[in-house]
Amino acid sequence: MTEIERHAHDVVVIGAGGAGLRAAIEARLQGKRVAVISKSLFGKAHTVMAEGGAAAAMGNANPNDNWQVHFRDTMRGGKFLNNWRMAELHAKEAPDRVWELEAWGALFDRTKDGKISQRNFGGHEYPRLAHVGDRTGLEMIRTLQQKVVAMQQDDHREHGDHEARIKVWAETTVTRLLKDGEGRICGVFAYVRESGTFVVFEAPAVVMATGGIGKAFKVTSNSWEYTGDGHALALLSGASLLNMEFVQFHPTGMVWPPSVKGLLVTESVRGDRGVLRNSDGKRFMFDYIPEVFREKYATTEEEGDRWYDDPDNNRRPPELLPRDEVARAINSEVKAGRGSPHGGVFLTVVDRMPGGAEEIRRRLPSMYHQFKELADVDITAEPMEVGPTCHYVMGGIEVDPDTGAALVPGLFAAGECSGGMHGSNRLGGNSLSDLLVFGRRAGLGAVEYLDGLATRPDVPDAEVAAASAEALAPFGRPDGENPYAVHAELQKTMNDLVGIIRTESELAEALETLDRLRARVAKVGVTPVAVGAGDGRGYHPGWHLALDLRNMLLVSEAVARAALERQESRGGHTRDDYPVMSADWRKVNLICRLSGDASAPVTGAHVDLRRQPMEPMRGDLIGLFETDELKKYLTAAELPGGDAAAGGGTGTGGDAAADEEGEQ
């Protein structure tokens, strides 16, 4: 019989990025015993790849900035499909979370008068991103990690044990959420990657903070950990996913050399005067300003360049349009034969900064070293080649906006694996502040749920046995399918058929291919290796991938099915056969649930889809927009004074949806 370790905690946080660590810190500050489970090394979360900054309306660069302006920008960027309550909470609370991070030791760049420096980013009306050069995510993780260590030192002084109230499990992967007989979360099942040891973490509350799904695509800025674990685990436990069709393709990833294709090129380059040019040398973004943004963006190079020094009297350059618009424009230029030699376009800061090469190296140190070391390109003297790369998923676990609670009792989510905050497209910089705002709220939500329990749920032996058998299954098929070959076909399918531009025929083909891949995933097999645990599970990346394939298959089906259903183009979802936004579709959320046998998700279950109406925005919030702008997004009945005028909301932004879901 396979040995299984057991550990008891109050709250288990899955993921050690910005959202996970902030949730864990909050639960620990409230006196709970917390386990943090990190798929990779502690401190190596994908958050470190977020380079540009954390968006927060502190008004340091422009005193006209405030939470209302930030809220408007976020809703515009998401094409009004955002959960408006989440956008409101984020805009209001982001400054406090950034100042809190500074109090914990974060070393932000400063203005001349000593305030936190804020930089420009696409879709933000004012310079709003608090930053540390172009390494902001790294500084965030360093600061949160040091906060965890400081709390562990406090616990050692008080209890004689550094891990008395917060313990980090590095290189550990969760494969199942465990539930008791009443359907409540009671813990998680995981394995330690180094040894292959199985571990059960008993806990009444679980916070999911696992990030995104990028490794389901061939070209991505995401690191190897991003296999849709949180999305899939939530589906398998009975939770729902929201608007999974919206996948953000960051407009600027490296395109050469092939070994680094997709690696992120931060938006800070464009925020710091960088411009995009095609093979003819033309600044082509002026040809791609959509009607909904035309009033706010410069139509000449001269005005766009003046904006950097005089933003009050000029409009911003179109290189700073929201990411979905820029990615589509680059894609169009390449398809028209005006791309760079390696299938991208040119991004340049040469002769664009007043301080010349020295200022480029100071403001963009990571980008300078990245291109110099990986592509032998000196960005102070020559342009970069860039192209779209799968970067972020706006869809995610459906949660209550105030508490982060999912539909399964005891399950909470924050960060990229949760849905709603960003609508159909995320603005750059909103991710890092999102992690802090909703990481804290999910941690508090878990504590409040825990405090309200009359009894702690027990972990059924049958749940553990089933999870163990599922994890061991690939070893029973030594001559089965190669997990790497299956993964490569899955990635190619998503990249080619569910990418930036989508059509009904290609999406239908993708679903057919995914259905065929389902049978292959069920037959994936591995052989034991001669290190680690005695049964050959230690240091076994083939086995790890075999288990991750289940998750990538589920989230890929959710993305493709939702993309086929939504017959419009909005944000990160572009349908070539339905090229315009529809005000009627704006009122619709697409909800994915797992149907069939969740204990056999590859062969016995599939993703079901249904439509769910959006909750009307609260009246005071809709009053922040001009009626002429609202007409671009809303139906006539939704406009102020219409039959379905806004203001009928509950103020929670998610309760009505949750109530409707609970009645199914």
Predicted features, each with a name:
Residues 240-373, 445-451:
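An anion/pyrophosphate-binding glycine-rich loop and adjacent beta-alpha core
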Residues 205-263, 425-445:
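Glycine-rich loop(s) and the adjacent beta-strand/alpha-helix scaffold that form part
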Residues 12-14, 201-210:
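Short hydrophobic core segments
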Residues 97-197, 209, 253-257:
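Conserved redox-cofactor binding core of oxidoreductases
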